[in-house]
């Protein structure tokens, strides 16, 4: 079966934020997501679009098709402002982080749609633990072959994105020692993790057809790779990032993803020779980013030497400066040095906990990240 790829000639953007719905009195997750979804469906005049997720304490908001990061900012600012008002009227609140610091997955309720029931029936324990939250960034691609080649390349830089965004050190009240606990929870699903490398779109089609014909997946939506093609949207979708505390971090990561995607697209279109890392090195780098975030080292994709993660990200951001100016996202990319200086979300959560000895205080700080 041929899988058509809807062309997007411009490097358009779309961003999805998975958010935690909490009880302001306790800071714990609350299964009020379906209530918010229903309200928004019944009152389209409000202008807020909220999507359900597997766990009822989760909702997703997203942008439309955006021409640049500035439009992403406008879309998300509008959606977050509307969401604050709707939540306030219902006595709930929301925050953004890769995991909740102390919520227990056994207490979760699940969305009872055929799709989500099938997900839990198939993945059982691994699916029921999915109280995890990510940030997904789409970038438009002109065709499937280009999308595949850009994914092959940007996957080598995905660990840097994870290190910057890592924001899930706690799980059920324990410090896991990881900067991104979400990463390891998510990898347990059957088709999650780093993407496979393909020579072209046909190679991707061949794999998807086998998985469909054997009942391994019901649709392409069940391919949960860290970076995947989205044929219906005509995009690549970068999914490796933890949900970040603030909108400013979302926009900085979006800018970096767009720059990398356009950079590698042009290399491919210009026929330039592209070096591909061994998958084992990419896997090692992903582990290092998951474990140590910005505090460790990554293997440099060019020199194959261990380099401090901060330095490697600084170099990469520096190489993207002229492209960022062309794309109009320089101001957003300029926020990344501040993240490198102050630390990622996991560092901040641990700092708050060290000062307060209270995970409720950590939740309050996370909630404040999107409060205005």
Curated annotation (Swiss-Prot):
InterPro entries on file: GCL_type2/YbdK_subfam, GCS2, Gln_synth/guanido_kin_cat_dom, YbdK
Listed GO MF terms: ATP binding; glutamate-cysteine ligase activity; ligase activity, forming carbon-nitrogen bonds
One GO-annotated biological process of the protein: modified amino acid biosynthetic process
Pfam families given in the database record: GCS2
SUPFAM superfamilies: Glutamine synthetase/guanido kinase
Keywords associated with the record: ATP-binding, Ligase, Nucleotide-binding
Source organism, top-level taxon: Bacteria
EC number: 6.3.2.2
Reactions catalysed, as given in the entry: L-cysteine + L-glutamate + ATP = gamma-L-glutamyl-L-cysteine + ADP + phosphate + H(+)
NCBIfam families: gshA_cyan_rel
Family affiliation: Belongs to the glutamate--cysteine ligase type 2 family. YbdK subfamily.
Functional note: ATP-dependent carboxylate-amine ligase which exhibits weak glutamate--cysteine ligase activity.
Protein name (Swiss-Prot/TrEMBL): Putative glutamate--cysteine ligase 2
């Amino acid at each position: 079966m041929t899988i058509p790829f809807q062309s997007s000639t411009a490097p358009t953007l779309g961003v999805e934020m998975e958010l935690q719905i909490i009880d302001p009195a306790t800071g714990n997750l609350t299964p009020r997501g379906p209530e918010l979804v229903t309200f928004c469906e019944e009152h389209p005049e409000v202008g807020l679009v909220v999507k359900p997720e597997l766990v009822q304490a989760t909702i997703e908001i997203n942008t439309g098709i955006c021409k640049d990061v500035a439009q992403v900012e406008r879309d998300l600012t509008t959606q977050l402002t509307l969401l604050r008002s709707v939540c306030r009227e219902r006595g709930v609140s929301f925050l953004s982080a890769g995991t909740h610091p102390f919520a227990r997955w056994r207490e979760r309720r699940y969305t009872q749609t055929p799709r989500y029931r099938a997900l839990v029936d198939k993945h059982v324990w691994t699916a029921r633990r999915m109280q995890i939250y990510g940030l997904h960034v789409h970038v438009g691609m002109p065709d499937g072959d280009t999308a595949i080649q850009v994914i092959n390349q940007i996957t080598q830089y995905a660990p840097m994105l994870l290190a910057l965004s890592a924001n899930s050190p706690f799980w059920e009240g324990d410090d896991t020692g990881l900067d991104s606990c979400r990463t390891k929870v998510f990898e347990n699903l059957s088709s999650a993790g780093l993407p496979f490398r393909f020579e072209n779109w046909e190679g991707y089609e061949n794999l998807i057809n086998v998985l469909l014909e054997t009942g391994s997946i019901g649709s392409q939506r069940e391919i949960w790779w860290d970076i995947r093609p989205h044929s219906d949207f005509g995009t690549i979708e970068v999914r490796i990032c933890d949900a970040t505390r603030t909108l400013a971090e979302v926009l900085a990561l979006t800018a970096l993803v767009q720059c990398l995607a356009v950079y590698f697209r042009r290399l491919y279109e210009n026929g330039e020779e592209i070096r591909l890392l061994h998958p084992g090195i990419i896997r090692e780098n992903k582990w290092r980013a998951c474990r140590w975030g910005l505090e460790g080292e990554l293997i440099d994709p060019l020199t194959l030497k261990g380099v401090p993660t901060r330095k490697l990200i600084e170099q990469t951001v520096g190489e993207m400066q002229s492209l960022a100016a062309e794309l109009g996202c320089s101001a957003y990319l300029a926020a990344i040095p501040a993240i490198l200086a102050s630390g990622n979300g996991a560092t901040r959560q641990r700092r708050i906990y060290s000062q307060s000895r209270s995970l409720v205080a950590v939740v309050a700080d996370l909630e404040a990240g999107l409060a205005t």
